[in-house]
Amino acid sequence: MLLKNLTLLEGFKIKIIDFQKYLREYDQTSGLYPKELMQIGEKYHQKEYLSRDELYQLAHLNSTRSSYHVKKNPARRVEKVTEAAYQIYDDFCRLTLYTGLMGIGIPTASAILTALDPERHCVIDTRVWATLYNLNYFDREKENFKADDYLKIIKIVRKMAAETEFTAAEIGYALFAYDVVHREGNLHQH
């Protein structure tokens, strides 16, 4: 396991992994498809909102298990919420708006943000948190996320991206793959 320390502007060291290696590994995982995610993001940028079908497609990329709940939202509500979120720059507020829709949790909301701006955002889930936990960024594992959890993760990921040639989205995919490669036992401990 290759770990390296980087000194950041704030004067503390950040542990990173071999992102290039784990980005190559990502293609072999069950993670979402970045190209499809970016295509949905392009549509979102063009119209400044997502239709219910587009949001379902994005949610299905991220979580096939819970994406069907997206279809329970009134179509106009999805358009209004995604349009309002598009106009806001604050990450916490955007996440809160997205998660007000049925079928959208923080992991899927993070995928929406990533579709819009892969330089600044990454898709988060249990695996990304677990990798950061194993690198000693967090003191416990976690399976359910709130907007504040995303903000904690993205702060670390953006620092990693700033010190490398990778985008925040690529860092997230590499962190996901790292957990796939190194996890012993089940992902979800119930």
Positions of PLM-derived features:
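Short loop/turn hinge sites at secondary-structure boundaries
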Residues: 47, 87-88, 118
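Short charge-dense sequence patches
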Residues: 5-9, 27-30, 45-47, 74-83, ...
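Helix-hairpin-helix/helix-loop-helix acidic hairpins
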Residues: 60-104
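Generic alpha-helix detector with strongest preference for long hydrophobic helices that associate
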Residues: 39, 79, 93, 108-113, ...
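Short alpha-helix boundary/capping elements
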Residues: 62-67, 117-121, 179-183
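Sparse, context-dependent recognition of short Cys/His-centered cofactor- or disulfide-binding micro-motifs
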Residues: 4, 43, 89, 97, ...
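Catalytic DNA-binding helix-loop module of base-excision-repair DNA glycosylases/AP lyases
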Residues: 93-134
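C-terminal accessory module of base-excision DNA glycosylases/AP lyases that mediates lesion recognition
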Residues: 1-57, 122-190
